[in-house]
Design a protein with these regions (language model features):
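A short acidic, Gly/Pro-enriched loop at the edge of an enzyme's catalytic core
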Residues: 10-22
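A short, conserved alpha-helix within the catalytic core of class I
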Residues: 26-40
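Short, charged, surface-exposed secondary-structure boundary motifs
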Residues: 14-17, 54-60
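Conserved Class I S-adenosyl-L-methionine
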Residues: 51, 58-80, 86-139
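Conserved SAM-binding strand-loop segment of SAM-dependent methyltransferases
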Residues: 1-13
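Conserved beta-strand segments of alpha/beta enzyme cores
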Residues: 3, 79-82
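Conserved beta-strand signature within the Rossmann-like core of class I S-adenosyl-L-methionine
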Residues: 41-53
Length: 139
């Protein structure tokens, strides 16, 4: 049986050493807090964008699109278990969905106005989605 909680990643409302598995998806990594709440031998999955995530959207937004940084970082007190790459292609077929996806990304904070205007002019967008799921075990 599982339970879910939505909270600040830096102040989880969870007792020390009480969690078997923790999922962190596109959120800041609060490694000290994860170390605190995970049981010995517990795992956490860290989901981050792969290099080409939303590449075709970035081609619309930027004159020179850039790949996302990909790294495998060791964390003290955790053993790196594995990484899984998940890829697919999605098609958004209306401007509202395209802009909603854009607003869920950090690109919405740093894209030049010209790029936003190009994106808003689209009626359809087909783009790659690509994630890395890193798995760690608390030592």
């Amino acid at each position: 049986q599982g339970e879910c909680a939505v909270a600040s990643v830096y102040h989880l409302p969870i007792m020390d050493g009480s969690i078997d598995f923790l999922l962190n998806c596109f959120s800041p990594l609060a490694i000290d807090e994860f170390r605190r709440v995970l049981k010995q031998g517990g795992h956490f999955a860290y989901v981050v964008p792969a290099a080409e995530h939303l590449w075709q959207m970035k081609e619309v937004l930027y004159d020179e699109p850039y790949p996302n940084e990909v790294k495998r970082t060791p964390y003290e007190g955790f053993r790196y278990v594995d990484v899984l790459e998940v890829r697919d292609t999605i098609t958004l077929d209306n401007p509202e969905d395209i802009f909603a996806l854009f607003q869920m990304t950090p690109y919405s904070w740093k894209t030049p106005a010209e790029g936003v205007a190009r994106l808003k002019s689209l009626t359809t967008l087909t783009t790659d989605i690509a994630f890395h799921i890193h798995l760690f075990e608390k030592e």
